[in-house]
């Protein structure tokens, strides 16, 4: 005989995290799960709180940085024939050390995802600026869990981005000549870093007009408006001098206290375009007539421009979808976004 009932205690209301689930989560939230990290996650609680506890602990950890190691590798005195571009190898080696052995795994994972959105490259103009490129990645690591508006400002004014997308040294127009503000950063900031080319629904799907065509987010007039915002910014004064101008400021090649390769670009008012600037128009935009008024300071123009971009309804779905693709799944559903 015997009973056919299930018997025994009922299953726990909140079961523990399964080992396979822990590995899957850590393979997305770090640079690879191990037996020890999976066990530590499982030991934090059941499947309702262990993940949040792990994430909270990761957020509290300080960033593992790159540039201190690159600075330490700079020789003193500098030998004949020293190639400063070789320090890019130090940055890469330190990056691998941080992501494979660093304690701040989630921060490094998110910073890596951000580096695939907010892109600079050591190839070309940045090849001989290894401290700027290392510090740029450090900016992403420090801001990995912060506000995207704050990060956009740091990225915009970072010399690595300034050199890479030619905002550094961008000059105002000169009447009677062909000299006009460089549009490179204005275009890429919108197209790649914030809103994309077409209007989106909150789930990341493309909005359509009455004819079924996608709706562009901006046009050439808006590109030119933002290009005028991004004029007048260049290297900060070298730490070895007390005053400098747009024309004579220069990059400091060697690391030193307060050196300008890792300081935000400085505004030189004499080269900032002070006229009106057309910006993005959308429901909820606060600038009258989608225009930055004439006569403002360069700092105020920059703040208004970044607010105008950051508050655009595309930013959430556009950036979120990219981060989901880098961190979780390459083809997220609209419901996921």
Task: List each language-model region with its residue ranges.
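Bacterial Sec-dependent N-terminal signal peptides
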Residues: 1-14
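Amphipathic interfacial helices
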Residues: 90-91, 101-109
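Short, flexible active-site-proximal loops enriched in glycine and acidic residues
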Residues: 106-110, 122-131
């Amino acid at each position: 005989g015997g009973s056919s009932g299930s018997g025994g205690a009922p299953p726990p209301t909140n079961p523990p995290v399964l080992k396979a689930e822990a590995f899957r989560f850590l393979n997305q939230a770090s640079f690879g799960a191990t037996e020890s990290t999976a066990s530590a996650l499982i030991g934090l609680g059941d499947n309702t709180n262990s993940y949040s506890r792990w994430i909270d602990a990761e957020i509290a950890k300080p960033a593992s940085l790159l540039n201190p190691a690159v600075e330490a590798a700079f020789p003193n005195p500098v030998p004949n024939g020293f190639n400063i571009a070789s320090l890019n190898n130090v940055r890469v080696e330190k990056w691998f050390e941080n992501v494979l052995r660093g304690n701040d795994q989630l921060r490094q994972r998110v910073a890596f995802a951000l580096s695939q959105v907010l892109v600079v490259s050591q190839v070309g103009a940045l090849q001989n600026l290894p401290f700027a490129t290392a510090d740029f990645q450090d900016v992403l690591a420090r801001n990995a869990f912060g506000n995207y508006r704050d990060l956009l400002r740091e990225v915009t004014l970072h010399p690595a981005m300034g050199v890479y997308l030619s905002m550094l040294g961008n000059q105002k127009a000169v009447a009677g000549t062909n000299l006009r503000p460089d549009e490179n950063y204005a275009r890429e900031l919108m197209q790649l870093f914030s809103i994309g080319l077409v209007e989106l629904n909150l789930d990341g799907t493309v909005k359509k007009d009455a004819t079924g065509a996608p709706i562009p987010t901006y046009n050439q007039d808006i590109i030119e408006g933002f290009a005028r915002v991004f004029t007048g910014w260049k290297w900060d004064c070298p730490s070895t001098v007390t005053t400098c101008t747009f024309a004579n400021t220069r990059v400091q090649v060697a690391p030193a206290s307060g050196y300008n390769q890792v300081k935000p670009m400085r505004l030189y008012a004499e080269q900032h375009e002070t006229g009106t600037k057309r910006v993005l128009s959308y429901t909820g935009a606060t600038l009258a007539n989608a225009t930055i008024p004439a006569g403002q300071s360069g700092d105020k123009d920059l703040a208004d421009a970044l607010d105008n971009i950051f508050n655009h309804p595309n930013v959430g779905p556009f950036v979120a979808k990219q981060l989901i693709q880098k961190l979780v799944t390459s083809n997220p559903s609209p419901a996921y976004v």
